[in-house]
Structure formats: structure tokens, C-alpha cells
Amino acid sequence: DDLEDTVNYAKACKFINKFMTENRFDLIEAVAEQTTRGLLKEFPKIKAIDFTINKPNAPIKLPFGNVAVSISRKWNKAYLSIGSNIGDKEGYLNQAIDSLYDDENCRVLAVSKFIETEPYGPVEQDNFLNGCVEIETLYEPKELLATVNRIEAEANRTREIHWGPRTLDIAIVLYNNDIVNEKDLLIPHVEMHKRLFVLEPLKQIAPYAVHPILNKTVSQMLEELQPDNKCAGCGGCSMKQMSEQ
């Protein structure tokens, strides 16, 4: 019971009033979305919001009592796997992390140490540098996918060769406890439990994060995938820790 742990409701009301008078919206859906995100960004102690906006004077030529939109938004916990095996590998990974820091819809909570791993697949290429990042984000899964794809593109990522070399690779490993099964997005990452180069850095920052399908922690999955067993994701990783971030 500490006031330091609460949000000042008067300040929140003033923020809403200022936000809605200084910005123009055509749709109440947009008002709800943008105001909610604004509140979550402005007041760090707010983790989730149920928000309703009423429009009792909507231009509807029929009898009605009220028109309203209700939404729920929150800071979502996500874990990203990052990797590079072209050029300044560490520089590309740090560029990705900096881009996440600069994104007002993301909060970087933790970054693992980087590890060096052998590549997977038939393509001869340099070893990878891999790491994991823990974030909170206002993005929904598809929005987060678009964001990490943009960050990859800014690092000149190309997809010409399957399992080929890349300047930057970012994968959404976990997103809350959600299961997403879409054509262009699978969460949790479909091969994460088989890949040391994902689990090893992920354990550094989230050993007790749980795979929502396998119902196993990161530590448990890593324990089952020992280096003397062949890693399905990299053929037996040769791992070396790099500088701490």
C-alpha cells in the first residue's frame, strides 16, 4: 500500500484531455487505439488498460442511446533471437538492439551475451554470432514481425539463399504465452527447442520462460539438448561466449 506504486489519476485525466484536444481523429476506433497507447507510454507503471470511449452524438439517423468502442491493450512480453554471420557481426546485432531501444513501442528489458555458433545447412559460410533480447512491446504479433523485418532490411538483409549467410536475422521466439499459427508467422518459434543457438542465450535472460506448447522452461529444453547430442538447428553448435552487452 504505497503511493509510489500507483498512477496519479489526475495526471492521467489531464493527459487524456491534452492528447485528445491536440490530435485530430476521424474514427473513435483510432481515438481509442492511440489514446491507449499514449497512456501506456506516458505512465510506465501502467501495464494494461481496458479503455472505453463513448460517442452519444454520433451522426446516425436512427434512434439510439450511445455508440462506444472498448479495447484492451497492454505491454506484451516478447523474446527475440538475433544472429549475424556477415561483416561486422557484433555491429549488426548492436544495430538491431539500438533500433529496438529507439522504437517508442518497445522497451528493451534484457540482452544476453553473444555466442559464436556454427552455421546450419549445406551452404558453406562463416560462423554466426547469436544472442537474445527480452522486450516489452505494444505491437501485436504481426506488427512486431513487420518491425523486425524492417530492422533486418535496414541492415541490408537479403533472402536469396535458404539457410544462407545474412547480415542480420531476427526471430520472434516467444510472445507472452501466445500461440500464433499463420502462414508467415509461427509463435513460439517452431524449432526453438532444437536449437542451442537460441536456447543458450535465451537461458541467460529468461531461464524460466515457458514454451506454451511443450510446457517446458527454457532451462529444461536446454538440458534436454546437450552439446554431445546433435542439435537439429545447427548440427552440433560450437559455442563461445563473446563480450557482454
Could you tell me what each predicted segment is?
Residues T52-P56, F114-E116, V173-Y175:
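Short loop/turn motifs enriched for small/polar and acidic residues
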